[in-house]
Amino acid sequence: MANPISIDTEMITLGQFLKLADVIQSGGMAKWFLSEHEVLVNDEPDNRRGRKLYVGDVVEIEGFGSFQVVN
């Protein structure tokens, strides 16, 4: 079961999502984090911090777990 991460907007970038999910401490860490960890968005590898995530998307992060974007 994926951990729900609530957003108040229509979409959020992957970099913003990592901070909101408490995976990273600051937005500046996103580029480094994505280069060092495998991240799957809807079961597809993605390392773009600007990747747009919408409600229903599932983000899996090796070593951190699975998260789902919700309203």
UniProtKB/Swiss-Prot annotation:
- Give the Pfam families listed for this entry: S4_2
Q: Which domain of life is it from?
A: Bacteria
Any one Gene Ontology molecular-function term assigned to this protein's record = RNA binding
Every S4 RNA-binding domain range: 12-69
Q: Does the keyword RNA-binding apply?
A: yes
> How does inactivating the gene affect the organism?
Disruption of the gene does not affect growth of the cell.
Keyword terms: Ribosome biogenesis, RNA-binding
InterPro entries documented for this protein: RNA-bd_S4-rel_YaaA, S4_RNA-bd_sf
Looking up Gene3D superfamilies in the UniProt record yields: RNA-binding S4 domain
One of the GO biological process terms = ribosome biogenesis
What more the UniProt record tells us is: Enhanced expression can restore both growth and sporulation of a temperature-sensitive mutation in rplB, designated rplB142.
Function of this protein?
Answer: May assist in the assembly of the 50S subunit.
Name this protein carries in UniProt: Probable ribosome maturation protein RlbA
Encoding gene (name): rlbA
